[in-house]
Amino acid sequence: MPIKILSPQLANQIAAGEVVERPASVVKELVENSLDAGANKIQIDIENGGANLIRIRDNGCGIPKEELSLALARHATSKIADLDDLEAILSLGFRGEALASISSVSRLTLTSRTEEQTEAWQVYAQGRDMETTIKPASHPVGTTVEVANLFFNTPARRKFLRTDKTEFAHIDEVIRRIALTKFNTAFTLTHNGKIIRQYRPAEELNQQLKRVAAICGDDFVKNALRIDWKHDDLHLSGWVAKPNFSRTQNDLSYCYINGRMVRDKVISHAIRQAYAQYLPTDAYPAFVLFIDLNPHDVDVNVHPTKHEVRFHQQRLIHDFIYEGISYALNNQEQLNWHTDQSAVENHEENTVREPQPNYSIRPNRAAAGQNSFAPQYHEKPQQNQPHFSNTPVFPNHVSTGYRDYRSDAPSKIEQRLYAELLRTLPPTAQKDISDTAQQNISDTAKIISTEIIECSSHLRALSLIENRALLLQQNQDFFLLSLEKLQRLQWQLALKQIQIEQQPLLIPIVFRLTEAQFQAWQQYSDNFKKIGFEFIENQAQLRLTLNKVPSALRTQNLQKCVMAMLTRDENSSSFLTALCAQLECKTFNTLADALNLLSETERLLTQTNRTAFTQLLKPVNWQPLLDEI
């Protein structure tokens, strides 16, 4: 068969195979067109699951008469004009394929009127011929699109449609997803003349929360944790459910980028990683997240359905989302859920606002009425400076740099430690502790493990007790070693090294200080620098920006620690001791974890500081217990 150019009709039907998968795809494309037209009231009428009729009516800007036929042509749009527009997309649609593709597999009627016109006009097209007919009509300002007999000319496609109930369920889910990100827009969804969904404009807090509850359920709102996380051009907002509100299937996960619903592996991985320590592998988190970023940094022109995106800085986006969700889960700042309006008005800080782009948009082009997207992205005077308040903007959870995607499988060292842990003791070692004493330890101290693992030439670790202490043996003497005190000693030793390894923060922490706090900073700045902190100081604005931290403290709540150090009593303990006292000790669930800490601390010990370690050893006297036998 010779190579030849396909006819426009055949090309449109091929494109329809990508854009128009089922009736829900038609609804999505047409509702997005209505939103791009500036509509704040949209009605969706469905008959027989969308196979017989899909009608979308809006009060947007409308389409001028002279552009009606052009609207049905392929690759015709008012939303972009050049390559620069394509690389910075904020509109929901931009490809100019939807109406052409839909009209090629259905009987499509488009009726529209602009505010400047005194009468409306209607264009009709159907099937492969794509011939359009324009005639006057009666219609208010806005647009109505009717799609009748979907796939009437492609029987093979039509027979793949599911039952009316199933197809309408997909349409319902599309409307629910769109309604979650457009609080200021009213949506009405009907099926066979019956109102199924009706979302009124949600201007007030109580109305907005009711919409979220109507879509996600009251239980989700009651268990929701608010997120408002910012860094330069990045803004993460919305809600994540507490871990106890997990799902058995991934049916309550809504994510939007610049108002566009998306499915992205980078985002999914970041969310799953943030929940990893809270949820089992067969449970799914529930969330409604809005991500706003500079449109130059994300490519939405990846797939005709526009569900997939590609980030220019995937690791930055991944870690930004991970940090924001981790902070929300760690702090458990639950959303206040009120049904009484007077109570709601007293909680303005919880107001849910529709995400807005942080970029300047130049006036709209005439062809697109009030909502053509031709953005001009000027850097604002303080574009790269986070919003400041009396408390730091990025609290409590600091970045740990780029994260690798290693599996959670144990390393070879861990496997060797566990093998030794499970090894049967030699008879000579078993004689070191009497059977009676061992039984007494098990009954009174809740010993988790009684295997002996040699940690050094002097001390042997016998057991981890209540996840708080190590039972150690040296010759015939026994000692208890507090893991909390050991960890604080390890921090002090690590921060006293001549060369301290530093960890750059992916997202710097910004502090807005009072005059008293800034004076304290000037007093302690050398101390911070000595132990590996790197700040940028802005004395005129009483502001500090933390860029690097000592690697030993990279997982700590450094925002809390720094602020505590700047408000501490000057007559208290030394700076380093006071700082280590503010750090949060980890929980040791296995003997191997405790042994790693002990080994790391011993590595840092020298002849001059070994006394500090010796002072942590508390002798255990077995004689009173042996006398009772």
From Swiss-Prot:
Q: Which Gene3D superfamilies match?
A: 3.30.230.10, Histidine kinase-like ATPase, C-terminal domain, MutL, C-terminal domain, dimerisation subdomain, MutL, C-terminal domain, regulatory subdomain
Question: Do you know which PROSITE patterns this protein is assigned to?
Answer: DNA_MISMATCH_REPAIR_1
The record ties this protein, via Pfam families, to:
DNA_mis_repair, HATPase_c_3, MutL_C
Disulphide bridges, residue numbers: none
**Keywords per UniProt:** DNA damage, DNA repair
Sample GO molecular function, one term: ATP binding
Q: Which GO terms describe its cellular component?
A: mismatch repair complex
Its family?
Answer: Belongs to the DNA mismatch repair MutL/HexB family.
**PANTHER family referenced in this protein's UniProt entry, alphabetically:** DNA MISMATCH REPAIR PROTEIN MLH, PMS, MUTL, DNA MISMATCH REPAIR PROTEIN MLH1
Its function, per the record, reads: This protein is involved in the repair of mismatches in DNA. It is required for dam-dependent methyl-directed DNA mismatch repair. May act as a 'molecular matchmaker', a protein that promotes the formation of a stable complex between two or more DNA-binding proteins in an ATP-dependent manner without itself being part of a final effector complex.
What the entry lists under HAMAP family is as follows: DNA_mis_repair (MF_00149)
Q: What is this protein called?
A: DNA mismatch repair protein MutL
Look up and give the organism this protein is from.
Haemophilus influenzae (strain PittGG)
| Lineage of source species | Bacteria, Pseudomonadati, Pseudomonadota, Gammaproteobacteria, Pasteurellales
